[in-house]
A protein has these predicted regions:
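Structured alpha-helical
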Residues: 1-181
Length: 181
């Protein structure tokens, strides 16, 4: 079964316990046989993080090309913080707001195999909202446009590597606490 909430989808398994007809409507009584859990419809897993990023809007000519190789390199970039990243895009916060549906250049570095690599990717701003608890700070959701398959795979590899590190650290921390008891 799937349940829709406020912009959220939940899923569980259920068994039909009873069925009957009432006022020309068929009614099913269901017994839940699993816990209700949030269902993620995304194509890519989102990894929570705090990474520095620099960005700028694309010029009209650049937006028409949508190719990273032909971007102007001398235009100023603004700083921001990526708060989650996936193989399909990212979410970042900044003290400025881009226009929704605009194309932007996103530049950030990821540590892969012990080496830092810079990514310069074009993204479409899907949504922008001012944070309720931090006036003047805006959250942006961005979807990558024309990202190279190799770069997408590297980003996904980075996410899985970081998740592995997090799980390992939690286990080690848990083991330390058990040993202290």
């Amino acid at each position: 079964l799937y349940f829709y909430g406020d912009n959220v989808l939940y899923q569980c398994y259920a068994r039909v316990a009873d069925r009957y007809k009432d006022n020309n409507r068929y009614i099913l009584v269901m017994d839940l046989i699993s816990n209700l859990r949030r269902y993620q419809r995304r194509e890519y897993y989102r990894f929570s993080c705090a990474l520095e990023m620099k960005s700028r809007p694309l010029e009209k000519e650049e937006a028409e090309e949508k190719v990273e190789d032909k971007l102007a390199t001398d235009l100023p970039l603004k700083g921001s913080i990526i708060v989650d990243i996936s193989g399909g895009g990212l979410r970042f916060v900044a003290d400025y707001a881009y226009e929704e549906q605009s194309l932007i250049l996103c530049k950030y570095r990821l540590l892969l195999n012990g080496r830092s690599k810079e990514y310069s990717l074009i993204g479409r701003v899907l949504s922008v909202r001012e944070l309720e608890n931090r006036r003047g700070v805006f959250e942006h959701r961005v979807q990558y446009i024309n990202v190279d398959a190799g770069e997408r795979e590297e980003i996904i590899k980075y996410i899985f590597d970081e998740e592995r590190k997090t799980i390992k650290n939690k286990r080690e921390h848990s083991d330390l606490l058990k040993n202290e008891e």
